[in-house]
Amino acid sequence: MTRRHVQRVVAALIVAAALAVWVQGLGAQSAQSAKDQYTIKPLPPGGPTPRLADGHPDFTGQWFPNGAGQGVSGRFGVDPTAIPQFDRKLSPEEPPQFRPEALAKIKSMTATELELSKSSVNCMPRGVPAIWLQNPYTTFIVHKPGLLAQLYEVLNNWRLIHTDGRPLPKSPEPFFHGNSTTRWEGDTLVVESIGFDERTYIMPNGWYHSDDLKVTERYTRPSMNYLIVEITVDEP
């Protein structure tokens, strides 16, 4: 029990290809510094939203993370249209509020325990939502009627989300990426997941979770080159 209320963790804007980097040529008399040689601009929309045979958006593609304060593979600037987490200037959302006992547990963690909360250290699957929040690498999505497969370019992580309307299990077997059910709300695919392995962490700062964790993801593809993923963590 680490949370008092539902808190949206991130509204992450993800692009389908690396940000366009425009290189300015240097003349013989140019005195520009190295960093001034590059102008980073948002990727253009790229065309209309591709769709499956049933008319729903097709999320298939190789997606680079580009939001929530994180650039593509940590090397490129963040798209200025992306919203950083808990930026009071851009969003009225408050940072997560922990119960006193949860906050005390996090503060009592040793340096070793905090390091082990990082999936890059413990080498276990990142889990959800950490696979989005702790992953600076690409995600390849294969979308077909009835199935959404996500292949992550880190530690051989993968995830299968059935989109055939099957309900959540009443007594779910805990998995690193949980047990999911889906529904469409217009052109947005809503994925609700429960039954997570408690060895995963929401963030690599000791933010642990209980077996009551529920994660809701909302996938929207407004154009060819962009995928918006909104994640809400609910931990009573």
Model-derived regions: residue spans:
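PEST-like low-complexity, intrinsically disordered acidic/proline/serine-rich tracts
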Residues: 2, 6-236
